[in-house]
Structures are given as C-alpha cells and as structure tokens.
Swiss-Prot record:
Signal sequence, start to end: none
Upper classification of the organism: Bacteria, Bacillati, Actinomycetota, Actinomycetes, Propionibacteriales
Biased composition (Basic residues): 1-19
GO biological process: translation
Protein name, entry field: Large ribosomal subunit protein bL32
Length: 56
C-alpha cells in the first residue's frame, strides 16, 4: 500500500473527497408481458428471462 511522504491538511483531504459524485442509473424502456417498464440496462436480460418478477 502507498505511504504518503508528506502530511495532507484536513482541508485538502476534504476538498478532494467532496469531488466524488454519483451518477444516476441509466434506465431503458423495455416491454415485458405487455407492460412498458423503465429498468436499469444491466437488468434487462433478467426481466426478459423471468428471473425478476414484474410487479403491478
């Protein structure tokens, strides 16, 4: 693991950490059992194969 050569100030550390941002999940429209759903792209196969039930 990397070892820092110099101490980082609390301000610098917090400024760096504050830059991390989340991105919203990309939703795609699919049709399952006659219903149009907006689901995450990585779950499309699971919905089509029936691994995830479609709730009303």
């Amino acid at each position: 693991m990397a070892v820092p050569k110099r101490k980082k100030s609390r301000s610098t550390t917090r400024h760096r950490r504050a830059q991390w941002k989340t991105t919203p999940t990309q939703l795609v429209e699919i049709r399952v059992e006659g219903k149009v759903l907006r689901v995450p792209r990585n779950l499309v196969k699971a919905y089509h194969s029936g691994l995830i039930d479609v709730e009303d």
